[in-house]
Amino acid sequence: MQVVDWPAWLERHIPYYEKQKQQDRYYDNPPASVLVVDPMDRNRRVGHRGFAWSTWEAMDADIRALHYRAEPVFLDNDTHQRWYWVFWDANEALMAVMRLS
């Protein structure tokens, strides 16, 4: 899992054809950062949790349980099968990584 600031994510972490769509989606209220979850991250057994996230719904439920202002981002074509959540508070994104690890 990693947290990437919003502008860097738009420039370097998503395909170029997704950039404009995501900029338009959050035009009025851009998020501060993005939580990027790779397949390796979600399939790893995690310390006190003792289990992996086998489905997107399971991980989304864990993120929602933190009660931070976050929402998932779905890309039209993500060949790397990464999962993304945007956060409007960068500190909450970092706390989410710590609490989910």
Label every model-predicted segment.
Residues M1-H80:
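The feature represents the first ordered module of a protein
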Residues E71-S101:
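Short, compact, well-ordered microdomains
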